[in-house]
């Protein structure tokens, strides 16, 4: 039998209930740090960008990002990751007001082995779909490109990287060409009782931007905990990141506060 991660086995009636509960929290913490784990999750991630220029404004993005593993063959799963962003974008012209609505939807499909070795990996296509409800909230382009994830989980660490680069393939001729890299490295250190320390900054590069203005590179740290409310497993975390490298262009932010609550649904093999 596997629960959460392939090959993870629980022995019955060998530990007190309190210890079993703590072990379950630890196992869940490791699973949520693995983007291609056999775990359905529905994260609600709120990103508050502070110091948005010009005018030292505030931008808010709520990402609804369900992750669902689907069996493909005896040896492989397809991990579907969708991000639906709900944004408030401040008006960067007159410094007052802003626009609220849905942004462009991203969808990634990772082919990942059900029983990986020490190196856990996934590879597949990434799509950026022009679902924005206002032109200032999206690109107006259909974009596609490759995506890859790789990680290792030596106790008590989880260390990995997730990256994709999408290119616009068609869309409005009056909209800018899309050629952008998203790269997220993640390092987590697991503590007792489901607690963990984490750093998972999101680095981006807009290859169409002027020279010297392409990269946004944040650094920061956060903490989180896996816990249960009734029978529902949850993962909550808070992180803060400083954009040490950022373009000197309208819309660039100085800081980001990230608050996330994930609903977790561990998969169990049916007998």
Regions found by a protein language model. Name each.
Residues 1-7:
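Bacterial N-terminal signal peptides
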Residues 12-271:
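Transmembrane beta-barrel domains of Gram-negative outer membranes and organellar outer membranes
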């Amino acid at each position: 039998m596997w629960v959460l991660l392939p090959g993870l086995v629980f022995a019955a009636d060998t530990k007190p209930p309190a210890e079993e509960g703590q072990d379950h929290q630890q196992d869940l913490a490791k699973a949520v740090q693995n983007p291609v784990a056999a775990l359905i999750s529905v994260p609600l991630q709120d990103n508050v960008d502070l110091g948005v220029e010009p005018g030292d404004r505030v931008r808010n993005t709520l990402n609804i990002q369900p992750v669902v593993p689907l069996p493909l063959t005896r040896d492989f799963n397809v991990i579907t990751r969708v991000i639906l962003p709900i944004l408030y974008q401040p008006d960067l012209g007159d410094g007052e007001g802003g626009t609220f609505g849905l942004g462009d939807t991203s969808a990634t499909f990772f082919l990942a082995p059900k029983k990986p070795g020490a190196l856990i990996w996934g590879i597949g296509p990434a799509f950026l779909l022009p679902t924005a409800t206002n032109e200032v909230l999206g690109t107006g382009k259909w974009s596609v490109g490759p995506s890859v994830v790789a990680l290792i989980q030596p106790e008590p660490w989880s260390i990995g990287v997730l990256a994709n680069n999408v290119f616009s393939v068609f869309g409005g001729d009056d909209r800018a060409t899309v050629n952008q890299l998203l790269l997220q490295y993640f390092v987590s250190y697991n503590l007792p009782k489901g607690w963990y320390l984490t750093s998972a900054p999101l680095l981006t590069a807009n290859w169409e931007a002027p020279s010297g203005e392409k990269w946004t590179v944040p650094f920061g740290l956060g903490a989180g905990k896996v816990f249960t409310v009734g029978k529902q497993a949850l993962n909550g975390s808070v992180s803060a990141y400083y954009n040490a490298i950022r373009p000197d262009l309208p819309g660039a932010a100085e800081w980001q506060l990230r608050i996330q609550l994930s609903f977790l649904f561990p998969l169990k093999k049916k007998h």
